[in-house]
């Protein structure tokens, strides 16, 4: 997680440094926490989340969270390469290219059967190999029933289970917080974009949150609630700018394995959110203010 969350930027990193998707996701998480803690109103949360998803630089994100109480400072972002380092790498790259060209020339001189070492028309390796193309069709529309169940299946294939601290599902990508298998005191964050990538950040463990099975909810009911959420909140479907679903354990100590699902909907005319249980039971509705 980049160190722009209210703390000084890493050496070599400036407010003009381009933001990554993981930086934007981290900002949205802090804004979600600020909404739940009462630091932000629903309208402020909607405006800041909308700005965070469109942020271009770390400075843009830093301004959105600078006045919030961030509990823990994340790991520092790696410093940018110096001009001297870039120059050194450039020289190494040039030397590598030269050695490759030399190798091509030697190989052509020994084995070549064309007029030029750059003429590959007679390459004996350019023959049909009978390998058919593999077309990948990973889940993309994650707010549909097929997309949502497909995402959970992809999670099982990647990690062997669907255990974790929190799953945030956007229309076309998702993020997942899981326990670090090497140290159960730490949390690893993963991003899904057609497949679960490598861990993008490691943050301090949240001791008061349980690890639960994040798939233990009625997916069909959840999709129905998502599709009806704009009308439930008094918004037009065509006005919706963003919608995302958070799946996490309930804070009720009497039901530690139960899930709480929070659905946030934003538009240019206000936003609101719904909180419901894994079986679809509505717990809370926050209408646009």
Curated annotation (Swiss-Prot):
Q: Give the principal location in a single coarse category.
A: membrane
- What parts of the sequence cross the membrane? 90-110, 257-277
Checking Pfam families in the record gives: DUF1707
**Is the keyword Transmembrane helix assigned to this protein?**
yes
Which compartments is it annotated to reside in? Cell membrane
What is this protein called in UniProt? Uncharacterized protein Rv0048c
Signal peptide location in the record? 1-19
Highest taxon of the lineage: Bacteria
Q: What are the protein's UniProt keywords?
A: Cell membrane, Membrane, Signal, Transmembrane, Transmembrane helix
Q: How does it sit in the membrane?
A: Multi-pass membrane protein
> Which GO cellular component terms are attached?
peptidoglycan-based cell wall; plasma membrane
């Amino acid at each position: 997680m980049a160190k722009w969350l209210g703390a000084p930027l890493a050496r070599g990193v400036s407010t003009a440094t381009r933001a990554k998707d993981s930086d934007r996701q981290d900002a949205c998480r802090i804004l979600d926490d600020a909404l739940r803690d009462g630091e932000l109103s629903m309208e402020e949360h909607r405006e800041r989340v909308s700005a965070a998803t469109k942020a271009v630089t770390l400075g843009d994100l830093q301004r959105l969270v600078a006045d919030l109480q961030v509990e823990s400072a994340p790991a520092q972002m790696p410093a940018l390469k110096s001009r001297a380092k870039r120059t050194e790498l450039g020289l190494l790259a040039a030397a590598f290219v030269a050695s490759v060209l030399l190798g091509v020339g030697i190989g052509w001189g020994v084995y070549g059967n064309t007029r030029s070492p750059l003429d590959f028309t007679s390459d004996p390796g350019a023959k049909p190999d009978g390998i058919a193309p593999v077309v990948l069709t990973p889940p993309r529309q994650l707010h549909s029933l097929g997309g949502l169940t497909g995402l959970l299946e992809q999670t099982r294939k990647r990690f062997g289970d669907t255990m974790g601290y929190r799953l945030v599902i956007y229309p076309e990508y998702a993020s997942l917080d899981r326990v670090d298998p090497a140290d159960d005191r730490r949390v690893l964050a993963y991003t899904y974009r057609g497949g679960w990538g490598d861990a993008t950040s490691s943050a301090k463990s949240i001791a008061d949150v349980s690890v639960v099975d994040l798939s233990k909810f009625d997916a069909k009911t959840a999709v129905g609630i998502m599709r009806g959420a704009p009308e439930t909140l008094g918004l037009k479907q065509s006005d919706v700018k963003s919608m995302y679903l958070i799946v996490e354990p309930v804070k009720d100590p009497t039901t530690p394995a139960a899930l709480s699902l929070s659905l946030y909907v934003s538009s240019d005319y206000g936003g609101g959110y719904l909180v419901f249980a894994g079986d679809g039971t509505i717990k809370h509705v926050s209408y646009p203010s």
